Amino acid sequence: MHRIVYLERDSIIAEVRRPDFPHHWAEHAKTLQSEVKERLAGATIAIVNKLQIDAELIAALPALQMVAVAATGANNIDLEACRVRGIVVSNIRGYASHTVPEHVLAMLLALSRNIFAYRQAVADGSWQRAEQFCFFDYPIRDLHGATLALIGSGNLGSGVARLAGAFGMHVLRSERKDALSVRPGYTLFAEALRQADAVSLHCPLSAETSKLIGESELRSMKPSALLINTARGGLVDETALARALQEGWIAGAGFDVLSVEPPRDGNPLLAPELLALPNFMLTPHIAWASQPAMQALADQLISNLEAFARGEPQHVLT
């Protein structure tokens, strides 16, 4: 009988049905990293979201057969160590194909039309003091006709492309940063950044993509460009982004992720002066979290467990 331990149950707000095979189920609302080893002792299946499962931990868990990641990103799992041990690692795919693209477009619309600046102008009485029916203190740009560069063209990037196309945007699919050749339908990374009125990140975080967007990339973008990140905080040099926003290298940014989550003191993107800027949006990693998306995630999570128990594992990363 499988022993299943769910370490971060509170990370999704959805009904999680029990698998259809014989098992013992234990779940914890939250788990500290220091508690993982003890709680997974004897487990054959671990369900995790953001907790680290590294080689040292894997070596201490001889019964472990499967790590079910309740998310798409699995940069918190030592996949090679799991592969060597024969541990199956599965992730969730396709569940956020509507909710994340909608969040991206919401950020693009709010920033391109300076919604927050104009809302504040009403709140502080600027409109009420105006001498005509409206005022134009902040530029308003249409998405129609603008160029959007996508870095990452998988399920989520393609979803953003579909919505952007409906708004009349011209979509560029960026080639990998260090690619020696360009695939048909793609644009050189550096050229995509230079042409873009907005850049949206949808690639996984890895050693190759860490700080993919740094000072040189930000300076190469148009001063009127926007940067959107709903993928992973580590894709961007956060110190460089803070400078870019304060010094006007780019026009604005919308982020749903930070390099360390939950964020702690010291992250440059949490500086009060930055959060006060009307051209910077920061949301608490909720682009994926519409109710339908979370339920789809929960359903697929259990489906992954059942497929593994049948000897037909799906969505395998190892």
Residue ranges and their predicted role:
Residues 224, 230-318:
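Rossmann-like dinucleotide-binding domain for NAD(H)/NADP(H)
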Residues 52-64, 79-81, 208-227:
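Rossmann-fold NAD(P) dinucleotide-binding segment
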Residues 51, 72, 197, 203-205, ...:
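Short glycine-/small-residue-rich Rossmann-like dinucleotide-binding loops
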Residues 21, 134-223:
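Rossmann-like dinucleotide/phosphate-binding beta-alpha-beta segment
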Residues 93-147:
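Phosphate-binding beta-alpha-beta segment of Rossmann-like dinucleotide-binding domains, i.e.
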Residues 43, 61, 195-196:
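An anion/phosphate-binding loop that grips the pyrophosphate of nucleotide cofactors and donors
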Residues 1-43, 172:
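N-terminal glycine-/charge-rich "phosphate-binding" loop or analogous flexible N-terminal tail
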Residues 29, 70-71, 87-98, 175, ...:
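Short beta->alpha connector loops at strand-helix junctions that form conserved
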